[in-house]
A protein has these predicted regions:
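Glycosyltransferase catalytic domains, chiefly GT-A lineage
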Residues: 1-175
Length: 175
């Protein structure tokens, strides 16, 4: 059974605006029969980019919401946001604080991808008692990141750019 609605999260800055537009278009073209709400998390976006994305989503008769992130929450975190990765990389960690409590699950997707198939099966993954579902990151042949973090690589390593988030769980456990 196909889901009737998807909530999709993207975290961007002005540098990734054009890529976000391409990702949104690819999602919409593969899901014309699904009601989709896009949730865009950002710290700084130009008014022109916001308007472009609004217009693009409207072409496909989908919805879009924008959430301006208070980056001060991340700047002093142990993640050292912005030093090795763009600060926007970490916005997904705040999704449960920004998106409406009426949204129970959301699919986070990086914007440097083109969706070529339907996402129904992944979106419907049973999330009972799980914070998130991800896909194995097959590009992690270099075990450096897991060793640096003290993580047992044999447990698997997910690609954080494709993640189904159980927002109810995140809110319950204050993630």
């Amino acid at each position: 059974m196909k889901p009737k609605h998807f909530d999709i999260i993207h975290c961007i800055d002005d540098n990734y605006g054009p890529q976000c537009g391409v990702t949104i278009t690819s999602i919409c073209m593969n899901h014309s029969d699904v009601d989709i709400t896009f949730h865009i998390m950002y710290a700084n976006l130009s008014k022109q980019l916001i308007e472009k994305l609004r217009n693009q989503v409207a072409i496909f008769n989908k919805s879009i919401f924008f959430y301006k992130i208070d980056v001060s929450v991340l700047e002093n975190s142990p993640l050292e946001g912005g030093k090795t990765l763009p600060l926007a990389t970490y916005y997904r960690l705040l999704v449960a604080q920004y998106v409406s409590p009426e949204v129970h699950r959301a699919l986070y997707l990086d914007v440097d991808m083109i969706v070529c198939r339907r996402l129904d099966a992944f979106y419907q993954t049973d999330m009972t008692n799980w914070a998130a579902a991800g896909v194995y990151d097959i590009s992690t042949l270099d075990h450096g990141p897991s060793e640096r973090l003290g993580y047992n690589f044999s447990l698997g390593y997910i690609n954080a750019g494709v993640m189904l988030i159980n927002l109810d769980y995140w809110r319950q456990y204050n993630i």
